């Protein structure tokens, strides 16, 4: 075991979390991380490595076009992949303001679908993955199929079953 990133890059707080690795078409190891800028807004950092023994290179932030990042302080559990020829980004934007028909909960599981060009996702569609109250922090794994899983139950909430020491 070794630490591959021992501090946040310049311009970011130490609130960096949830690395999600994947292999690029060129055979590079790339990973995305949720991060917080020094101005306390959330983002996603993209790193790349040639192999497991190399030092990660910061490629920059992932830009999701047309996503209102106002008041968002952290992008938790980022996941970036291609599906059916489209770029897909799944994340949980903490602090997202409520909108008329979506983002009504305290915590959200969100996806953006579009064309991925370098570190820019030209999103054609941005929406919550689930409009219920208890689905959060989704991630995917892939073998022959891509499987999505996430939390059932949210932090910082009181549930009626808490008195029985059962939650989610």
What is each PLM-predicted segment?
Residues 1-168:
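Carbohydrate-active catalytic/glycan-binding domains of CAZyme proteins
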């Amino acid at each position: 075991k070794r630490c591959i990133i021992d501090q946040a890059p310049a311009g970011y707080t130490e609130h960096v979390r949830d690395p999600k690795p994947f292999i690029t078409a060129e055979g590079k190891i790339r990973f995305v991380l949720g991060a917080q800028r020094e101005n306390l807004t959330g983002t996603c950092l993209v790193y790349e490595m040639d192999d497991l023994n190399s030092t990660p290179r910061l490629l920059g932030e992932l830009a999701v076009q047309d996503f209102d990042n106002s008041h968002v302080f952290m992008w938790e559990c980022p996941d970036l992949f291609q599906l059916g020829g489209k770029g897909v980004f799944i994340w949980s934007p903490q602090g997202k303001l409520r909108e008329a028909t979506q983002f009504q909960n305290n915590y959200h599981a969100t996806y953006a679908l579009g064309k991925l060009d370098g570190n820019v996702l030209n999103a054609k569609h941005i929406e919550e993955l689930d409009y219920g109250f208890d689905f959060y922090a989704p991630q995917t794994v892939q073998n022959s199929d891509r499987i999505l899983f996430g939390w059932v139950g949210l932090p910082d909430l009181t549930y009626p079953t808490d008195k029985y020491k059962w939650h989610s």
